[in-house]
From Swiss-Prot:
<feature type="disulfide bond">
    <location>
        <begin position="13"/>
        <end position="27"/>
    </location>
</feature>
<dbReference type="GO" id="GO:0006952">
    <property type="term" value="P:defense response"/>
</dbReference>
<dbReference type="Pfam" id="PF03784">
    <property type="entry name" value="Cyclotide"/>
</dbReference>
<keyword id="KW-1015">Disulfide bond</keyword>
<feature type="disulfide bond">
    <location>
        <begin position="8"/>
        <end position="22"/>
    </location>
</feature>
<comment type="function">
    <text>Probably participates in a plant defense mechanism.</text>
</comment>
<dbReference type="InterPro" id="IPR012323">
    <property type="entry name" value="Cyclotide_bracelet_CS"/>
</dbReference>
<comment type="similarity">
    <text>Belongs to the cyclotide family. Bracelet subfamily.</text>
</comment>
<keyword id="KW-0611">Plant defense</keyword>
<feature type="disulfide bond">
    <location>
        <begin position="4"/>
        <end position="20"/>
    </location>
</feature>
<feature type="cross-link" description="Cyclopeptide (Gly-Asn)">
    <location>
        <begin position="1"/>
        <end position="30"/>
    </location>
</feature>
<dbReference type="InterPro" id="IPR005535">
    <property type="entry name" value="Cyclotide"/>
</dbReference>
<dbReference type="InterPro" id="IPR036146">
    <property type="entry name" value="Cyclotide_sf"/>
</dbReference>
<protein>
    <recommendedName>
        <fullName>Cyclotide mden-E</fullName>
    </recommendedName>
</protein>
Length: 30
């Protein structure tokens, strides 16, 4: 639920490397 400061509209979350995932076109962590 914490925004990672990255969008995932066109590309996957690079921040997935630290546990972020795409939700509603924005990368979140928990």
């Amino acid at each position: 639920g914490i925004p990672c400061g990255e969008s995932c509209v066109y590309i996957p979350c690079i921040t997935a490397a630290i546990g972020c995932s795409c939700k509603s076109k924005v990368c979140y962590r928990n």
